[in-house]
Amino acid sequence: MTPTPTATLVARDWAEIQERMLVPLYEAVYDRLEVGPGDRLLGLDCGAGLALLLAAARGAAATGVEADPARRALARDRLLEVLAQPPAASSAARPYDALLAFSPAPETLAAALPAVRRGGAVVLADWGPAERCTVPSVPGGGPAPRDLDTVVERAGLRPDGSGRVFCPFGYADVDSAVRGLLSTGLYDGASDASLAEKELAEALHPFERPDGTVWLPNIFRYVIARVA
C-alpha cells in the first residue's frame, strides 16, 4: 500500500517535530528496565522508530511494529527492523525480553504478547493526570488517559511497578506546535479537520512565550507488568 501524500506529510511531522518529545519517557523506561546489550525489545506502534534507536544505542536488539505505511517507511529509512504487524511467536529467533507500547489497542497487545518470553517486561504508557497535562483539547479530540492498570489486568499480566515522567512539549512556534500535535492522532476524531486545526492554534496561544516558542508541560505515566 502506497502512503497518500497527506499521510506522508503527517508522518514526517511526527518524525521531525513530535517524536522527540517522548524521549524522557523512553529513557526513563529503559533506565528502569536496565536495557542493555543482549536484550531483545519489541516496540508496538513505534512510529518512525526513535524509541528503537535509543534502545539500540544501549546495545539492545530492537524490532518495531507499525501499521501506518508512511511511518513504517521512515523507520526503515533509519535502517530499523519494523514489521507491519506483531510477529508470530514461532518467527522470532528467541522470545523478546521486553515490549513497549503507548496506549495500545487491546487486540494489538494481545497479538504481540506471545512473542515475549515468560517473565518478560511489558511496559504500557499513557497520559498522566489531566491536571498535570497542558496539551489542549478541542471539539473532537485531545488527550484521553486510559486506565493502564485495567489493561494489564485484562491482558492477564502480572503488575510489577509504575512511574511518572515529566515530558514537556516544546515547539519553535504555534505552527510547529499545531503540526506536531496533529501528527499524534489525538485530533483525528474531529468532524471538521480545518476547524480543529484553527481551534487548536487558538488554544495554544496562552502557552506561547514572548519569543514565539510554545511550551506545554506534561506528565506521562507508565506501568510495568510481567508475562505470566
Language-model features: locations:
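A generic alpha-to-beta junction signature in SAM-dependent methyltransferases
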Residues: 33-35, 56, 109, 116-117, ...
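Class I SAM-dependent methyltransferase SAM/SAH-binding core
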Residues: 40-91
